[in-house]
């Protein structure tokens, strides 16, 4: 039910919003500061390709993709560099300041925003007018930038959808039908209350984890996170207050592990030990449970994510950006398209729990196969793929909801859930603090 975590190899890209804001001050102020490269019609020259923490697990795969590209385009050479997750955005900032960005660079959501907002990335939509139809619409749209029209500033790479994972044995013990999982936030809470009432304190329903639940739960409830101009937070509503009050009530009734209000890093252990009903909403988690807790895996069931009033999930894609002033634009663009092509993304998905952003790749029979319907990992792969076909950006965390904003909101929610302040005060204070942070970010 909580937002899907990025694959482990990408987790290191997520750094504090404050760090991004501060570091970005040293970058060029706009696209006019960087000269736009032009295509020559010849795929040639040496380009640099930077990935994030793919060695050594995926060395053979990536090198194979590079070798095949160089065989097709013998005048082009790809210099591959793989860097650790720690300090990834700081390195991007330093390279941008020094004019040393790679020609093709792996970007997460925040690092894309960091470089894109400052005009450091090429508009890939103008490089090939046919590119848009090659990718899942939700993924392609994700890499547009506010105020820049139909420009798209990175090729979508791999994605990870949100699903619902639960222990069907504990589900049934609580008097719930495993074939009827919750579809709305309100229903999810109703189920959690029943689980708490029937468990006798032997297991919990879900992790409190307000950092992971917000703003997703509110979006699914139809709560407006921002105003129409996208410059003010507007979540201070009766619905948000009701969410806090329900969380407080469920917390008091034992629907969540007490320690999960402050941390959620032990969920694998709790779920694997049969101590919690709902696991993380990630296909990768299902694979981990299969490997590490086979007895619980046998009782694991998966379903479509709780989507509430939205009716669809969001989409979070890794991407490949192209340096705006690359000296070899043809080679860089062709290589980025090569890496993100259907066949190459499908092959990658066989080695990691990821999904193609490429429409052809997502249409591969592998992603429709549910087997006999008994293996949770196989079913999870099919459900995730099906949901990606209708994924849309209005279910994504807004870029304005930085880590700083999230932390500020969560602090107030934690106080209210523990009973240290009332729900209405918590939501009001959270919105006020969030708007202060947003205003300060705009000034910078």
Model-found features: residue ranges?
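Short, low-complexity disordered leader/linker segments with a strong preference
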Residues: 1-48, 71, 425, 435-444
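Short, solvent-exposed loop/beta-turn-alpha elements that line the ligand-binding surface or hinge
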Residues: 125-138, 181-183, 198, 203-205, ...
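Extracytoplasmic "Venus flytrap"/periplasmic binding protein-like
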Residues: 68-137, 173-175, 180, 270, ...
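Helix-loop-helix "hinge/cap" segment bordering the ligand-binding cleft or interdomain interface
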Residues: 71, 75, 146-212, 226-261, ...
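Short, well-ordered beta-strand elements
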Residues: 41-56, 76-81, 103-104, 153, ...
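Hinge/lid segment of periplasmic solute-binding proteins
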Residues: 109-161, 217-218, 301
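Extracytoplasmic/periplasmic substrate-recognition and gating elements
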Residues: 67, 174, 245, 252-256, ...
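C-terminal capping/gating helix-and-loop segments adjacent to ligand/active sites or protein-protein/ligand interfaces
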Residues: 378-430
């Amino acid at each position: 039910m909580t937002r899907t975590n990025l694959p482990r190899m990408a987790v290191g890209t997520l750094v504090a919003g404050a760090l991004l804001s501060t570091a970005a001050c040293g970058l060029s102020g706009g696209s006019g500061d960087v000269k736009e490269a032009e295509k020559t019609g010849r795929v040639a020259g040496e380009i640099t390709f930077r990935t994030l923490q793919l060695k050594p697990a995926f060395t053979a795969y990536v090198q194979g993709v590079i070798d095949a590209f160089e065989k097709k385009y013998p005048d082009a050479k790809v210099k591959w560099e793989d860097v650790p997750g720690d300090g990834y955005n700081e390195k991007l900032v330093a390279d941008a300041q020094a004019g040393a960005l790679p020609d093709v660079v792996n970007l997460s959501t925040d690092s894309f925003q960091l470089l894109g907002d400052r005009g450091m990335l090429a508009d890939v939509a103008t490089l090939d007018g046919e590119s848009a139809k090659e990718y899942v619409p939700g993924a392609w749209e994700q890499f547009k930038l506010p105020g820049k029209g139909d420009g798209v500033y990175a090729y979508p790479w791999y994605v990870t959808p949100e699903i619902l994972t639960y222990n069907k044995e504990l589900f049934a013990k609580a008097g719930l039908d495993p074939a009827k999982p919750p579809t709305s936030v309100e229903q999810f809470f109703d189920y959690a209350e029943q689980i708490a009432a029937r468990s006798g304190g032997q297991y919990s329903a879900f992790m409190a984890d307000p950092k992971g639940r917000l703003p997703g739960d509110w979006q699914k409830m139809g709560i407006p996170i921002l105003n129409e101009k996208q410059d003010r937070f507007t979540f201070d509503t009766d619905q948000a207050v009701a969410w806090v009050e329900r969380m407080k009530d469920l917390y008091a009734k034992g629907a969540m592990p007490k320690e999960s209000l402050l941390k959620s890093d032990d969920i694998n252990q709790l779920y694997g030990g049969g101590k919690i009903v709902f696991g993380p909403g990630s296909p990768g988690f299902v694979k981990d449970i299969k490997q590490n807790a086979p007895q619980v895996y046998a009782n694991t069931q998966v379903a479509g994510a709780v989507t509430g009033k939205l009716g669809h999930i969001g989409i979070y894609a890794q991407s490949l950006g192209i340096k705006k002033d690359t000296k070899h634009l043809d080679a860089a663009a062709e290589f980025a398209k090569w890496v993100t092509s259907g066949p190459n993304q499908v092959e990658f998905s066989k080695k990691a729990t990821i999904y193609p952003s490429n429409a052809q790749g997502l249409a591969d029979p592998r992603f429709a196969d549910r087997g006999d319907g008994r293996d949770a990992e196989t079913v999870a792969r099919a459900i995730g793929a099906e949901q990606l076909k209708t994924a849309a950006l209005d279910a994504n965390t807004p870029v304005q909801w930085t880590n700083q904003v999230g932390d500020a909101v969560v602090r107030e929610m934690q106080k209210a859930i523990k009973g240290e302040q009332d729900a209405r005060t918590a939501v009001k204070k959270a919105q006020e603090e969030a708007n202060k942070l947003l205003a300060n970010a705009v000034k910078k």
